[in-house]
A protein has these predicted regions:
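Acidic, metal-coordinating helix/loop segments flanking the phosphotransfer/catalytic sites
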Residues: 66-74
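C-terminal accessory helical subdomains adjacent to catalytic cores in phosphodiester-
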Residues: 2-4, 9-23, 35, 39-55, ...
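Short hydrophobic beta-strand that contains or immediately precedes a catalytic carboxylate
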Residues: 26-29
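Short phosphate-binding loop-to-helix
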Residues: 59-67
Length: 167
């Protein structure tokens, strides 16, 4: 007579299969605001969204792309993105060429990343300096120095995408 297990006993000891989230590498020109924003966004997104490694390089665009290349060699990433500001960087074109050659996406904020933050709050379409945008964010009490405040409306990222498409 064979020993038969109950269906519930058969399942015991089996581990459910783990879903592997895609891993992304994001290297930013900024060391505070961009990294903080992406951390907040990652918490807002569904748990099965990508797992991000965030690095604030704090350098010109070419150094940001080169850092992404170094980091990418050490990890198994599904994709790599660099965030840089347009500013007046002499290295921007070289960074874009290298990134294209190495299959790295570069998102260039014009004039600065803080414009993306402002779009969480209002439809801002006029040409402005980085200083003007940062001053507006401070007046709205969502940016203090370079740090986002707890009142920053991270949940409005869908509105932000729509506003950026109109600008």
């Amino acid at each position: 007579m064979s020993s038969r297990r109950k269906p519930s006993e058969k399942r015991r000891g089996r581990r459910p299969q783990r879903f592997e989230r895609p891993r992304g590498l994001v290297v930013t020109e900024g060391t505070v605001t961009e990294v903080q924003y992406l951390q907040m966004l990652q918490q807002e997104l569904p748990r099965d969204a990508a797992s991000l490694k965030l690095i604030g390089e704090g350098a010109d665009p070419l150094r940001v792309v080169k850092r992404a290349l170094r980091e990418r060699k050490d990890g198994d990433y599904s994709w790599t993105v660099c965030l840089v500001d347009c500013d007046n960087h002499e290295t921007l074109q070289d960074a874009l060429r290298l990134a294209t050659k190495e299959n790295i996406r570069v998102l260039v904020s014009n004039p600065c990343f803080e414009l993306w933050l402002l779009w969480h709050l209002e439809d801002w379409r006029r040409h402005s300096s980085s200083r003007d945008i940062q001053a507006r964010l401070a007046k709205l009490k969502v940016l203090q120095d370079k740090s986002l405040t707890s009142s920053f409306p991270i949940g409005r990222y869908a509105d932000t995408r729509a506003r950026s498409g109109k600008a």
